[in-house]
Swiss-Prot record:
<comment type="pathway">
    <text>Cofactor biosynthesis; pyridoxal 5'-phosphate biosynthesis.</text>
</comment>
<dbReference type="GO" id="GO:0042823">
    <property type="term" value="P:pyridoxal phosphate biosynthetic process"/>
</dbReference>
<protein>
    <recommendedName>
        <fullName>Pyridoxal 5'-phosphate synthase subunit PdxT</fullName>
        <ecNumber>4.3.3.6</ecNumber>
        <ecNumber>3.5.1.2</ecNumber>
    </recommendedName>
</protein>
<comment type="function">
    <text>Catalyzes the hydrolysis of glutamine to glutamate and ammonia as part of the biosynthesis of pyridoxal 5'-phosphate. The resulting ammonia molecule is channeled to the active site of PdxS.</text>
</comment>
<feature type="active site" description="Charge relay system">
    <location>
        <position position="215"/>
    </location>
</feature>
<dbReference type="InterPro" id="IPR021196">
    <property type="entry name" value="PdxT/SNO_CS"/>
</dbReference>
<dbReference type="Pfam" id="PF01174">
    <property type="entry name" value="SNO"/>
</dbReference>
<keyword id="KW-0378">Hydrolase</keyword>
<feature type="active site" description="Charge relay system">
    <location>
        <position position="217"/>
    </location>
</feature>
<dbReference type="GO" id="GO:0004359">
    <property type="term" value="F:glutaminase activity"/>
</dbReference>
<dbReference type="InterPro" id="IPR029062">
    <property type="entry name" value="Class_I_gatase-like"/>
</dbReference>
<dbReference type="GO" id="GO:0006543">
    <property type="term" value="P:glutamine catabolic process"/>
</dbReference>
<dbReference type="GO" id="GO:0036381">
    <property type="term" value="F:pyridoxal 5'-phosphate synthase (glutamine hydrolysing) activity"/>
</dbReference>
<comment type="similarity">
    <text>Belongs to the glutaminase PdxT/SNO family.</text>
</comment>
<dbReference type="GO" id="GO:0008614">
    <property type="term" value="P:pyridoxine metabolic process"/>
</dbReference>
<feature type="binding site">
    <location>
        <position position="127"/>
    </location>
    <ligand>
        <name>L-glutamine</name>
    </ligand>
</feature>
<dbReference type="InterPro" id="IPR002161">
    <property type="entry name" value="PdxT/SNO"/>
</dbReference>
Length: 236
C-alpha cells in the first residue's frame, strides 16, 4: 500500500536542501523520498556537510552504530548544536531514539558507558520495544497533522511498518503525540508490565522536530516526509 504525492505535493520540497545522516541504516530510501518531493537530498557524513541544510533526516538502522559513528566522524557535537539551534529534524526508528532526551534501556559499550543521543525531544524511549526482527509487523495508524492530504474531508490512515521499533514511554509538556498503536502481540512486546493494555506512542512532534517509530520510506508512504517538509517551510 502506498500514498503517492499529488502533482502539487510532489514539488512541495522544491528549492530545499534536506540532509540525510548517511552513516548507517536505510539512508538511501530517505534520500529517494527527499528527491521525490522535489528537494535536493544530501548525504551527511562530515560536520561541514551540515552547512546550508534546510532540514535533516536521521534514518532507521542501529541507533548504537549511528551513535558510535557520529562520534568517530566528529558529527555528534555539531549535530547536537544544530538541533538545539533550531534545525528541523525528522528521526525514523533509530532516528527517534537518537532524538530522545532519555533512553529507558540504553545499550552500553565495553567500558559500561551508555549510548548517547543527540537530544532535542523531551521524551523517554525504549529500544526494540515491539520485539525482535521476526516480530516485525504492519498496521494502519490514525496520524495527526496530515489534514493537507484529506480527500472528501477524510484523512486516509498511515500504513506503518515496525521493524524492531522503539516506542515512547514518556513525553514532556512540549511534545505532541501524533500516533499511537496497540502492540500487535503483547506476548512478544518487550517490557509491558508497567503499561499493561496501554496504547504505545509511535509518533511525536515538538516544534520543528518530528519522530516516528516506524519506516514510512519502506512502504512508499510519502505523507510523513511531506509533513516534515511543510514543517521546514512553517506551513504545518
Amino acid at each position: 500500500m502506498t500514498n503517492s504525492l499529488s502533482a502539487e505535493s510532489a514539488r512541495v520540497g522544491s528549492g530545499l536542501r534536506i540532509g540525510v545522516l548517511a552513516l548507517q541504516g536505510d539512508f538511501r530510501e530517505h534520500l529517494r523520498a527527499a528527491a521525490e518531493s522535489g528537494a535536493e537530498g544530501v548525504s551527511v557524513r562530515r560536520p561541514r556537510e551540515l552547512d546550508g541544510l534546510d532540514g535533516l533526516i536521521i534514518p532507521g538502522g542501529e541507533s548504537t552504530a549511528i551513535d558510535k559513528l557520529a562520534r568517530a566522524f566528529e558529527l555528534a557535537g555539531p549535530l547536537r548544536e544544530r538541533i538545539a539551534g533550531g534545525l528541523p529534524v525528522y528521526g525514523s526508528c533509530a532516528g527517534m531514539i537518537l532524538l530522545a532526551s532519555d533512553i529507558a534501556d540504553p545499550a552500553t559499550d565495553l567500558s559500561g558507558a551508555p549510548q548517547q543521543t543527540f537530544g532535542g525531544l523531551d521524551m523517554t524511549v525504549r529500544r526494540n520495544a515491539f520485539g525482535r526482527q521476526r516480530e516485525s509487523f504492519e498496521t494502519d495508524l490514525d496520524f495527526k497533522g496530515l489534514e493537507f492530504s484529506a480527500t472528501d474531508a477524510d484523512v486516509a490512515p498511515v500504513h506503518a511498518v515496525f521493524i524492531r521499533g522503539p516506542w515512547v514511554e514518556r513525553v514532556g509538556p512540549g511534545v505532541e503525540i501524533l500516533a499511537q498503536v496497540e502492540p500487535a502481540d503483547p506476548e512478544h512486546a518487550s517490557h509491558t508490565a508497567e503499561l499493561p493494555g496501554a496504547a504505545r506512542i509511535v509518533a511525536v512532534r515538538s516544534g520543528r522536530l518530528l519522530a516516528t517509530s516506524f519506516h514510512p520510506e519502506v512502504t512508499g508512504e510519502k505523507r510523513v516526509h511531506e509533513l516534515f517538509i511543510r514543517m521546514i517551510r512553517g506551513e504545518a
